[in-house]
Amino acid sequence: MSCRSEHIWIEPIKGARKTSNFCWAIILFLGSLGFLLVGTSSYLGRNLISLFPSQEIVFFPQGIVMSFYGIAGLFISSYLWCTISWNVGSGYDRFDIKDGIVCIFRWGFPGKNRRVFLRFLIKDIQSVRIEVKEGIYARRVLYMDIRGQGAIPLTRTDENFTPREMEQKAAELAYFLRVPIEVF
Protein backbone atom coordinates (compact mmCIF):
# COMPACT_ATOMS: atom_id res chain seq x y z
CA MET A 1 0.00 0.00 0.00
CA SER A 2 2.43 2.62 -1.17
CA CYS A 3 1.54 6.26 -1.72
CA ARG A 4 2.82 7.61 -5.00
CA SER A 5 2.66 10.82 -6.98
CA GLU A 6 4.71 12.27 -9.80
CA HIS A 7 7.52 13.50 -7.53
CA ILE A 8 7.17 11.57 -4.24
CA TRP A 9 6.97 7.86 -3.45
CA ILE A 10 6.27 6.78 0.14
CA GLU A 11 6.52 3.07 0.91
CA PRO A 12 5.24 2.08 4.39
CA ILE A 13 7.12 -0.78 6.06
CA LYS A 14 5.30 -3.28 8.24
CA GLY A 15 7.15 -4.02 11.46
CA ALA A 16 6.65 -6.62 14.16
CA ARG A 17 2.85 -6.42 14.08
CA LYS A 18 2.39 -9.35 11.77
CA THR A 19 -0.15 -12.15 12.16
CA SER A 20 2.58 -14.75 12.56
CA ASN A 21 4.18 -12.83 15.44
CA PHE A 22 0.82 -12.58 17.22
CA CYS A 23 0.24 -16.32 16.75
CA TRP A 24 3.71 -17.26 18.03
CA ALA A 25 3.39 -14.95 21.03
CA ILE A 26 0.03 -16.45 22.02
CA ILE A 27 1.15 -20.06 21.49
CA LEU A 28 4.38 -19.49 23.41
CA PHE A 29 2.59 -17.73 26.27
CA LEU A 30 -0.05 -20.45 26.68
CA GLY A 31 2.47 -23.29 26.34
CA SER A 32 4.93 -21.83 28.83
CA LEU A 33 2.10 -21.02 31.24
CA GLY A 34 1.03 -24.66 31.03
CA PHE A 35 4.58 -25.86 31.72
CA LEU A 36 4.87 -23.53 34.71
CA LEU A 37 1.50 -24.66 36.12
CA VAL A 38 2.46 -28.33 35.79
CA GLY A 39 5.80 -27.70 37.51
CA THR A 40 4.11 -25.72 40.29
CA SER A 41 1.40 -28.36 40.78
CA SER A 42 4.06 -31.08 41.06
CA TYR A 43 5.83 -29.00 43.73
CA LEU A 44 2.64 -28.33 45.70
CA GLY A 45 1.28 -31.86 45.22
CA ARG A 46 -2.13 -30.48 44.18
CA ASN A 47 -3.87 -30.47 40.83
CA LEU A 48 -3.72 -26.96 39.40
CA ILE A 49 -4.46 -28.44 35.97
CA SER A 50 -7.16 -31.11 35.99
CA LEU A 51 -5.98 -32.89 32.82
CA PHE A 52 -3.78 -35.35 34.70
CA PRO A 53 -2.98 -36.05 38.34
CA SER A 54 0.05 -34.25 39.77
CA GLN A 55 1.26 -37.43 41.49
CA GLU A 56 2.42 -38.75 38.12
CA ILE A 57 5.03 -35.98 37.80
CA VAL A 58 7.73 -36.00 40.43
CA PHE A 59 9.02 -32.54 41.34
CA PHE A 60 12.65 -33.58 41.12
CA PRO A 61 13.72 -33.65 38.21
CA GLN A 62 10.61 -33.37 35.95
CA GLY A 63 8.82 -30.61 37.87
CA ILE A 64 11.96 -28.45 38.11
CA VAL A 65 12.66 -28.82 34.39
CA MET A 66 9.07 -28.01 33.44
CA SER A 67 9.09 -24.96 35.73
CA PHE A 68 12.36 -23.80 34.15
CA TYR A 69 10.93 -24.23 30.63
CA GLY A 70 7.79 -22.38 31.69
CA ILE A 71 9.75 -19.42 33.09
CA ALA A 72 12.05 -19.30 30.04
CA GLY A 73 9.02 -19.42 27.72
CA LEU A 74 7.34 -16.58 29.60
CA PHE A 75 10.47 -14.44 29.17
CA ILE A 76 10.60 -15.15 25.43
CA SER A 77 6.86 -14.52 25.13
CA SER A 78 7.18 -11.19 26.95
CA TYR A 79 10.00 -10.23 24.55
CA LEU A 80 7.73 -10.99 21.59
CA TRP A 81 4.86 -8.99 23.10
CA CYS A 82 7.19 -6.04 23.71
CA THR A 83 8.43 -6.04 20.09
CA ILE A 84 4.81 -6.20 18.93
CA SER A 85 3.68 -3.34 21.17
CA TRP A 86 6.69 -1.17 20.22
CA ASN A 87 6.21 -2.19 16.55
CA VAL A 88 9.94 -2.66 16.06
CA GLY A 89 11.01 -2.51 12.42
CA SER A 90 8.09 -0.47 11.14
CA GLY A 91 8.55 2.81 9.34
CA TYR A 92 8.66 4.13 5.81
CA ASP A 93 10.87 4.76 2.79
CA ARG A 94 10.36 8.18 1.18
CA PHE A 95 11.77 9.02 -2.23
CA ASP A 96 11.41 12.69 -3.18
CA ILE A 97 12.49 13.41 -6.76
CA LYS A 98 11.62 17.11 -6.54
CA ASP A 99 13.96 17.79 -3.58
CA GLY A 100 16.40 15.02 -4.58
CA ILE A 101 16.29 13.37 -1.13
CA VAL A 102 15.69 9.81 0.07
CA CYS A 103 14.58 9.29 3.69
CA ILE A 104 14.48 5.88 5.36
CA PHE A 105 12.83 5.74 8.79
CA ARG A 106 12.44 2.73 11.12
CA TRP A 107 11.32 2.29 14.72
CA GLY A 108 13.73 0.39 16.95
CA PHE A 109 13.79 -0.69 20.57
CA PRO A 110 13.26 1.98 23.25
CA GLY A 111 16.32 3.93 24.21
CA LYS A 112 18.67 6.48 22.77
CA ASN A 113 18.46 5.16 19.19
CA ARG A 114 14.75 4.29 19.05
CA ARG A 115 14.29 6.29 15.86
CA VAL A 116 16.51 5.19 12.99
CA PHE A 117 16.48 7.90 10.33
CA LEU A 118 18.73 7.78 7.26
CA ARG A 119 18.80 10.63 4.77
CA PHE A 120 20.83 10.98 1.60
CA LEU A 121 20.74 12.49 -1.86
CA ILE A 122 19.23 10.71 -4.85
CA LYS A 123 22.31 11.54 -6.92
CA ASP A 124 24.35 9.33 -4.51
CA ILE A 125 22.27 6.24 -5.39
CA GLN A 126 24.32 4.05 -7.70
CA SER A 127 21.78 1.28 -8.33
CA VAL A 128 18.87 -0.79 -7.08
CA ARG A 129 20.07 -4.32 -6.39
CA ILE A 130 18.22 -7.61 -6.02
CA GLU A 131 20.03 -10.31 -4.07
CA VAL A 132 18.68 -13.82 -4.62
CA LYS A 133 19.64 -16.87 -2.56
CA GLU A 134 18.01 -20.10 -3.67
CA GLY A 135 17.76 -23.31 -1.69
CA ILE A 136 15.64 -24.64 1.15
CA TYR A 137 15.30 -21.18 2.67
CA ALA A 138 15.17 -19.10 -0.49
CA ARG A 139 15.24 -15.36 0.04
CA ARG A 140 15.10 -12.29 -2.12
CA VAL A 141 16.16 -8.92 -0.74
CA LEU A 142 15.99 -5.52 -2.41
CA TYR A 143 18.94 -3.22 -1.71
CA MET A 144 19.83 0.32 -2.66
CA ASP A 145 23.55 0.88 -3.33
CA ILE A 146 24.64 4.27 -1.97
CA ARG A 147 27.95 5.85 -2.88
CA GLY A 148 30.16 5.86 0.23
CA GLN A 149 27.65 4.00 2.44
CA GLY A 150 27.27 0.60 0.81
CA ALA A 151 24.04 -1.31 0.36
CA ILE A 152 20.94 -0.44 2.37
CA PRO A 153 18.20 -3.11 2.52
CA LEU A 154 14.74 -1.92 1.52
CA THR A 155 12.87 -5.18 2.16
CA ARG A 156 13.00 -7.54 5.10
CA THR A 157 14.51 -10.99 4.71
CA ASP A 158 11.34 -12.64 6.01
CA GLU A 159 9.11 -11.06 3.35
CA ASN A 160 8.45 -13.85 0.89
CA PHE A 161 8.06 -12.06 -2.41
CA THR A 162 7.70 -14.11 -5.54
CA PRO A 163 10.40 -13.49 -8.15
CA ARG A 164 7.88 -11.59 -10.28
CA GLU A 165 6.85 -9.31 -7.37
CA MET A 166 10.47 -8.58 -6.48
CA GLU A 167 11.38 -7.81 -10.09
CA GLN A 168 8.32 -5.58 -10.44
CA LYS A 169 9.13 -3.65 -7.28
CA ALA A 170 12.80 -3.24 -8.27
CA ALA A 171 11.89 -2.15 -11.80
CA GLU A 172 9.38 0.44 -10.57
CA LEU A 173 11.82 1.86 -8.03
CA ALA A 174 14.71 1.95 -10.51
CA TYR A 175 12.50 3.66 -13.09
CA PHE A 176 11.27 6.20 -10.52
CA LEU A 177 14.82 6.98 -9.32
CA ARG A 178 16.32 6.67 -12.83
CA VAL A 179 19.08 4.28 -11.74
CA PRO A 180 20.14 0.84 -13.09
CA ILE A 181 19.12 -2.54 -11.64
CA GLU A 182 21.70 -5.14 -10.58
CA VAL A 183 20.95 -8.79 -9.78
CA PHE A 184 23.20 -10.94 -7.60
Curated annotation (Swiss-Prot):
Pfam assignment, any one: Ycf4
Source organism superkingdom: Eukaryota
Record's keyword terms, sorted: Chloroplast, Membrane, Photosynthesis, Plastid, Thylakoid, Transmembrane, Transmembrane helix
UniProt xrefs under InterPro entries: PSI_Ycf4_assembly
Membrane topology: Multi-pass membrane protein
Membrane-crossing residue ranges in chain numbering: 22-42, 57-77
Cell compartments where the protein resides: Plastid, Chloroplast thylakoid membrane
Stated role: Seems to be required for the assembly of the photosystem I complex.
Protein family per UniProt: Belongs to the Ycf4 family.
Record-given protein name: Photosystem I assembly protein Ycf4
